[in-house]
């Protein structure tokens, strides 16, 4: 007679094989725990358990939907005064309530890098919601379509120009105070970036930096040509020998009267993209970041940080600290927006199908166990 513990050790593989034939499960990853030795007394009451199986449930490819979460960090850097401001709203419809009907998820982010004092940037932060969504007749729609996004772009364009005029009308703000402005909006799978100035938005697409804005500086050929046509000039890399950017809100001491062509304008440039599983996160930063590092270097730092701790707030701080280490000479503001709950995507795709755990248990009576023993014994 074979000892009980030995019988148990032989039975487990037999039952596993039988289970696989009955279920005909495709794509099964199996983890088999070791079978512990048992006393003969315990063997008769033992329950033989099929090891836990990892079954990849067949699902249809799902349309990507961003799972938005973000973090930000701001630091005065080596400057005596802080002139940067920023806005971070991960749930825009939740923030605005009935004022907004738009495709979900939806979010709004803004970075304002002031110059000539903090007043213009502070004004933009204080009044951004009113300027962008309340006064601008922001379009209302629950479905994603081309006409909605065209209306959004037109509305944001008007908001930039309205903000510029508002800064001129506010007597509490110096006419020499101005600010760059970059706004990023997410509606459903669409990412829209509007920029006037040298803040920058950079998308990480499978680890590769994709710039979603262009720096409006005198060294940019298209801007240089426009400035010359308007009667302006570039001196030592500065617009009219004074300003390092060619687009900004405010700075009315440098702008022509309303209605006249001016070398310095508040007109935003737009870039739009449809987010996919390949799009991991977006970095928005002021020029204090980009003056000392490339877009790809910034993406690499944030990506490594997310792999270590998965915290966009910490990533924003780490990026700013890297800029300080590289001896930036400006204020620092960074926003990191992730599009998935984990690095590398949002909704599960067919290649990353959800895993379902299946446990199948079978207890054998003493009689059944004896029958198995007899069946396994060699014929004499």
Swiss-Prot record:
Q: What Gene3D superfamilies does the record tag this protein with?
A: PPM-type phosphatase domain
- Residue positions annotated to bind Mn(2+) 1 are 113-114
**Manganese listed as a keyword:** yes
Q: Which UniProt keywords apply?
A: Hydrolase, Magnesium, Manganese, Metal-binding, Protein phosphatase
Question: Under which EC number(s) is this enzyme classified?
Answer: 3.1.3.16
Q: How is the cofactor bound?
A: Binds 2 magnesium or manganese ions per subunit.
Q: Is the keyword Signal in the record?
A: no
Domain of life per record: Eukaryota
| UniProt similarity note | Belongs to the PP2C family.
Q: Which cofactor does it need?
A: Mg(2+); Mn(2+)
By what name is this protein known?
Probable protein phosphatase 2C 2
How would you classify this enzyme at the top EC level? Answer: hydrolase
Residues the entry annotates as binding Mn(2+) 2: 113, 287, 330
Source species of the chain: Oryza sativa subsp. japonica
Task: Give any single GO term for biological process.
Answer: signal transduction
* PROSITE patterns per UniProt: PPM_1 (PS01032), PPM_2 (PS51746)
Domain PPM-type phosphatase, by residue range, is 69-339
Catalytic reactions on record? O-phospho-L-seryl-[protein] + H2O = L-seryl-[protein] + phosphate; O-phospho-L-threonyl-[protein] + H2O = L-threonyl-[protein] + phosphate
What GO molecular function annotation could you give as one example from this UniProt entry?
metal ion binding
């Amino acid at each position: 007679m074979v000892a009980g513990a030995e019988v148990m050790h032989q039975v487990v593989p037999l039952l596993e094989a039988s289970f696989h034939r009955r279920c005909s499960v495709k794509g099964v990853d199996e983890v088999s725990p070791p079978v512990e030795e048992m006393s003969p007394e315990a063997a008769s009451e033992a329950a033989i358990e099929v090891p836990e199986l990892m079954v990849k449930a067949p699902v249809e490819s799902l349309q990507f939907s961003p799972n938005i979460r973000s973090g930000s960090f701001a630091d005065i850097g080596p400057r005596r005064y802080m002139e940067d401001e920023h806005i971070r709203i991960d749930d825009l419809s939740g923030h605005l309530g009935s004022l907004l009907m738009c495709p979900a998820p939806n979010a709004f982010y803004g970075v304002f890098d002031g110059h000539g004092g903090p007043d213009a940037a502070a004004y933009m932060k204080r009044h951004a919601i009113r300027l962008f969504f309340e006064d601008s007749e922001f379009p209302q729609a629950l479905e994603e379509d081309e006409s909605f996004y065209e209306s959004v772009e037109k509305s944001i364009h008007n908001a930039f120009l309205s903000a510029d005029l508002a800064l001129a009308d506010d007597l509490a703000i110096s006419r020499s105070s101005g600010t760059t402005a970059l706004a990023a909006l997410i509606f459903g799978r669409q990412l829209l970036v509007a920029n006037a100035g040298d803040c920058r938005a950079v998308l990480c697409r499978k680890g590769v930096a994709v710039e979603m804005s262009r720096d409006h500086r005198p060294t940019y050929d298209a801007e240089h040509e426009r400035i010359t046509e308007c009667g302006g000039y570039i001196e030592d890399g500065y617009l009219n020998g004074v300003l390092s950017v060619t687009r900004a809100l405010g700075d009315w001491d440098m702008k022509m009267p309303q209605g006249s062509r001016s070398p310095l304008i508040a007109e935003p440039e737009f870039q739009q993209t449809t987010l996919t599983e390949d799009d991991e996160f977006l970095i928005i930063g002021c020029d204090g970041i980009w003056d000392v590092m490339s877009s790809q270097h910034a993406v690499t730092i944030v990506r490594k940080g997310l792999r270590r701790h998965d915290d966009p707030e910490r990533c924003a701080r780490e990026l700013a600290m890297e800029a300080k280490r590289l001896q930036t000479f400006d204020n620092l503001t960074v926003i990191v927006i992730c599009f998935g709950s984990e690095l590398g995507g949002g909704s599960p795709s067919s290649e990353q199908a959800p895993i379902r755990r299946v446990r199948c248990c079978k207890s054998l009576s003493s009689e059944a166990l004896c029958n198995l023993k007899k069946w396994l014994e060699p014929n004499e």
